């Protein structure tokens, strides 16, 4: 592997990168990307560069992204009033439709930018390669849930094919409907249930 052609010139030295690769080559990195990173062009470009390098040096990773500010913008544009209960957004049938739209737009943007750098990625969402089965959180919150099961085999198959799954914090309930999850909760559940060895 010609690391000097992969690592940015202002990045760490090659000896340090080789140590990092040797240490973590048998593990899976679970990366949380918050909505603030996605809205800041400089941070977003750095995030894309980092994920691309991780893929090209042969490390395995999963990216879970949020999008709270993008969701708020989408709801405001459509005059949807937001209510919160204990810090969680109440999501009725109309609200969840716009939440899904905002998150899928973000997911598509991340995929597009990574593919433009020849990074091997795939989308994980209720519409494409769904792996998350949901339990509703409460009737009060509407379409808000937590993971019931996560399809470990499906995720590992993507990773074995040298792909980085880009995961939307959405899943399907037993009723076939889409639910939103807390991003951090999803990250923790991926670590506990899906991966043999993870770090972040």
Give residue spans per PLM region.
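Nucleotide/pyrophosphate-binding catalytic subdomain
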Residues: 1-200
């Amino acid at each position: 592997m010609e690391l000097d052609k992969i690592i940015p010139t202002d990045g760490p030295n090659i000896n340090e990168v080789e140590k990092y690769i040797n240490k973590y080559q048998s593990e899976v990195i679970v990366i949380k990307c918050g909505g603030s990173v996605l809205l800041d062009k400089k941070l977003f470009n750095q995030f894309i560069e980092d994920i691309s390098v991780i893929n090209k040096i042969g490390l395995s990773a999963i990216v879970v992204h949020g999008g709270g500010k993008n969701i708020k913008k989408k709801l405001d544009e459509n005059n949807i009033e937001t209510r919160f209960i204990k810090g969680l957004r109440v999501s009725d049938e109309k609200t969840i439709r716009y939440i899904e739209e905002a998150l899928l737009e973000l997911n598509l943007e991340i995929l597009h930018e990574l593919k433009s750098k020849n990074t091997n990625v795939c989308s994980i969402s209720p519409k494409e390669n769904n792996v998350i089965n949901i339990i509703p959180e409460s009737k009060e919150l509407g379409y808000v849930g937590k993971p019931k099961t996560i399809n470990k085999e499906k995720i590992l198959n993507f990773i074995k094919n040298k792909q980085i799954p880009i995961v939307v914090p959405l899943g399907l309930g037993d009723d076939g409907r889409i639910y939103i999850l807390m991003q951090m909760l999803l990250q923790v559940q991926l670590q506990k249930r899906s991966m043999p060895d993870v770090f972040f």
